[in-house]
Amino acid sequence: MRKCLLILFFAFAAAGASAAQIDTVAVCSTKMQREIPALVVVPDAGVGRRMPVLYLLHGFGGSYTTWQNITDLRPLADACGMIVVCPDGANSWYWDSPLDPASQFETFVAQELPDWIDARYLTIPSREGRAVTGLSMGGHGALWVALRHKDRFGAAGSTSGGVDIRPFPDSWEMKKQLGELKDNPERWNAHTVIRQAASLRDGELALIFDCGYQDFFYQVNLNLHEQLMRQGVGHDFLVRPGAHNAAYWSASLPCQMLFFQRWFARNAPPAGRDGLGAACGVYRRLDHRR
């Protein structure tokens, strides 16, 4: 925790002078036949050099701007030396919905978005150069996508994540994606993170997840931790006072980014310099100065 606080200190001390750029981009999804907006935060050190990428997913009712509204991502990207990508996930839970062909966000986050980013930014285009995390619905989505696409992501996290959806069958429009739990119990079982994690083996993914004691998702996160312990799967599980809110998530993100930074340092190829990586397809560049 002390090191996380140091990251916060140095990041926000540099916020006024942060040179990271934020691009707003439109990414074409072939599977959904539409464009999906996203924010791309490129640290100053990323100009002309390949860098790892953190995909950062929002929660239910949020959008691609949620994380930037919670905390300024530019100094964090600069301090941790990684590109940060925040896609819009609507209220999809980041599944490929078996009921709604217009909601195929697992394919988007796992395949279409990384391919688009790799083609336009100077990334490290392999699982060793990609991590994914998110808050609430996005925490579920990050673990869901990473568990099912370990060839695409080497590290994953969740903060206040809905890692077991089954205790909440009437909440957050999940019925629109999966149908009623009582009519589709096997579908709900198959679409929850804690069940997906049951086959995970130690070393297949670097994992970090956290939850506040006062969060309604605390128990399901504790259950996931205990399951992984029984399976012998190494992971970082952090708990501390806090509820399901922006104050908790803004404090959690630096800790998770430190975890990913360390993992990238051990696993990603050295970031070599290349020609300038101009971002094609950018339709609006934002200046998020505060």
Language-model region placement:
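Sec-dependent N-terminal signal peptides
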Residues: 4-13
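Non-catalytic cap/lid and distal C-terminal segments of serine-dependent acyl enzymes
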Residues: 19-290
